[in-house]
């Protein structure tokens, strides 16, 4: 391991804010948004992204969401962690994280973790909060985290450009 790098548990590099989640069933959510204009609604997020809208918000800010159940944990190319920003509602199928390290570095890292030792379940995989907290994160110094994040963003932009020209 390079000098200055450390192996940390996720709970030491991100604040876990699962206490801000509030489950709501689809019938109640649908009744709350009935007859409301889209401008009166807020994004409603689940394990893999936005799953709808709701008439209120529980959090406001920039957060990283990581699937709890229903996420494609064993697909190494699939998104398991994604950014959200602004006023929104997160359901109980996603963990809410506030990174204490470089935001993008942690997001990219969590999308490439091998989750097989962290998830449970036979038909629907679940990442419990305690297992999530124990995920090992290889953490370089902050300047290196930022350099890695910038390079990954550049490479994704390059891929997008190439894909547009195919």
Q: Language-model segments: which ranges?
A:
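A short beta-sheet element
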Residues: 46-50, 54-111, 120-133
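A common structural junction motif
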Residues: 114-118, 156-158
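Short low-complexity linker/loop segments enriched in small residues
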Residues: 135-137
